[in-house]
């Protein structure tokens, strides 16, 4: 996290859910480079968040836990005297949770969600499979976690970006999705746009799920962030 001027906009970058072994470390390590670019080239204060259970972060994965991590990151940035406003940028699961967090935090100025699912119903249909996968990739290390499996699983149905997107309006929402995403259907992007009511939708032709590595998607994101500077000093809706 860095900033070089006295009053700057701030952004939290939230990674997605890892898909394979060792990806829990990779997922959280992929965004610091982007954060440095946003800070160095655009003058923002940028935080690359490593959710609990990923990278060097302690704790174990749960959707509510990740949502709490996002809220804590926003609170941390808002406490900085030099910060003029906070935005959220999330990839995959991090994008969906960014929408949910911002809907409940009216001081967040806007959200960009890339490759974000509209809900987690697929996970909710097979919660034990998700739990075992989370153990396999190192996101759950404690053998006794979760102490309340039913509660852990319930979060998979209760936390839904599509339900929270209307609460983000009229604050800006950018939805970016790959036309060839094989993990999250492009239909989810359109559902989120409709739920918000005034979101900007950009479909990347031929792109898959990992938009962090697509130069076109990153260019769209940086352009959107640059336009958000004009919102500084105005109420976030």
Give the role of each language-model region.
Residues 5-41:
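Short, surface-exposed "cap/lid" segments of acyl-processing enzymes
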Residues 17, 50-55, 117, 207:
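Short beta-to-alpha linker loops that shape the active-site pocket of alpha/beta-hydrolase fold enzymes
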Residues 1-3:
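A short loop-to-beta-strand scaffold at the N-terminal edge of the catalytic core in hydrolase folds
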Residues 30, 60-80:
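Alpha/beta-hydrolase active-site loop
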Residues 81-92:
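Alpha/beta-hydrolase fold nucleophile elbow
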Residues 105-191, 195-203, 207-208, 212-237:
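The alpha/beta-hydrolase serine catalytic core
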């Amino acid at each position: 996290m860095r900033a070089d001027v006295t009053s700057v906009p701030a952004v939290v970058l939230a990674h997605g859910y890892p898909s394979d072994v060792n990806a829990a470390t990779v997922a959280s390590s992929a965004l610091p480079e982007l954060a440095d670019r946003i800070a160095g080239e655009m003058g923002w204060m940028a935080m690359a968040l490593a959710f609990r259970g990923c990278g060097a972060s302690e704790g174990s994965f749960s959707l509510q836990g990740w949502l709490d991590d996002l809220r804590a990151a926003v609170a941390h940035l808002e406490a900085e005297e030099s910060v003029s406003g906070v935005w959220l940028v999330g990839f995959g699961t991090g994008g969906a949770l960014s929408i949910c967090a911002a809907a409940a935090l009216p001081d967040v100025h806007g959200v960009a969600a890339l490759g974000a699912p509209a809900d987690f119903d697929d996970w909710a249909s097979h919660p034990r499979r998700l739990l075992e996968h989370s153990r396999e990739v190192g996101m759950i290390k404690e053998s006794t976690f979760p102490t309340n499996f039913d509660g852990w699983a319930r979060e998979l149905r209760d936390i839904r970006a599509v339900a929270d997107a209307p609460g983000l309006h009229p604050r800006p929402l950018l939805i970016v999705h790959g036309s060839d995403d094989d993990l999250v259907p492009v239909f989810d992007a359109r559902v989120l746009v409709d739920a918000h009511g005034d979101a900007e939708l950009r479909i990347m032709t031929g792109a898959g799920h990992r938009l962090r590595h697509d130069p076109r998607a990153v260019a769209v994101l940086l352009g959107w962030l640059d336009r958000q500077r004009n919102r500084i000093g105005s109420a976030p809706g």
